[in-house]
Structures are given as C-alpha cells and as structure tokens.
Amino acid sequence: TGVIMPPKGYLKRLREICTKHGILLIFDEVITGFGRLGSAFAAQEFDVIPDLITCAKGLTNGAIPMGAVLVQNHIYDDMMAAGKGAIELFHGYTYSGHPVAAAAGLATLEIYRSENLLHRAADLAGYWEEAAHSLRGCKHVKDVRNYGLVAGIELESMPDAPGKRAYEVFVRC
C-alpha cells in the first residue's frame, strides 16, 4: 500500500547501525525525490546521508524515462579503483547514452531551480494533506497516509478478489 513513513529517529538509527557494521544504506527516492517531501530528497528531510540514492521519474518530470544512482565519493572511488585504467563508474549500459533524456533531465532540473519548485512543493503540502485526508470515511477507504506531496489511499479488498476494487476506482476516475 505504500507511503508508510518511519518513526522519528528511525532512519538516523538505521544509518548508525549500517555504518557500525559496514552495510551500505540505500534510499530508493524514485517516489520521494525532487521535492515531494519538501526537500530535494527524503534523505535531507530526515537528515540522513545514505551511501546510495536511486531516483527517476522526477529527474525528467516523467516526460522521458530516465533514472540515476547517486553515490557517495567513497563508493565512486572504490569502483574506479576496481580495474586498471577504469575511466567511468561501471553501471550498466541498457539505458545509458541517451542525449534526449539527458537534455530533458537538465531542463527539468533548471526549471526546479529557476521556479523554486522544491520550496513551492513544501508550501503545498498542507493543501494536499487536507485534500487526501478528506477521503477518510468514504466508502471502502481503509486508510489515508501522507507526507509532503506523497499520499497513499488504502482501499478495502473485496473478498476473494484482491485488487478488484482499486481497479474499479481506477476505471471510474
């Protein structure tokens, strides 16, 4: 159902545990990145520095498929040192080298900056929360959760037909 936010302090404690045991902390910010929680990334919102951040969608405003993995310097340095004459972070090539997607990404990031969209998103959070939570008490709405501009609306399942009610709502909307 998604949009289940961690309790206060949870991610900071997780960072401590990962650091203590040499475990990489990875944040999947495909949904939460690019201002949806009020900061560029959820990591900033929760004041945690992960080792890797995955992001997509918001990178090009969803106009063209593009994803990225942001890594801390120590990971990049280790990857670069892995092979003689390494000239790049070996990341796979299925979706690399697409100038149109790169141009869309650069244009999107410039619009985020020039129109102050990350901060404007934070300003809209209260309105979005009120709108999403207005669905509480509606027929078949089991739960409503949100943080910033991200919301999850959980619908009751139909007996013996999981997903059917959500599909019917999708078709009507």
What residue spans do the PLM features occupy?
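Conserved N-terminal phosphate-binding loop of PLP-dependent enzymes in the Aspartate aminotransferase
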Residues: 1-173
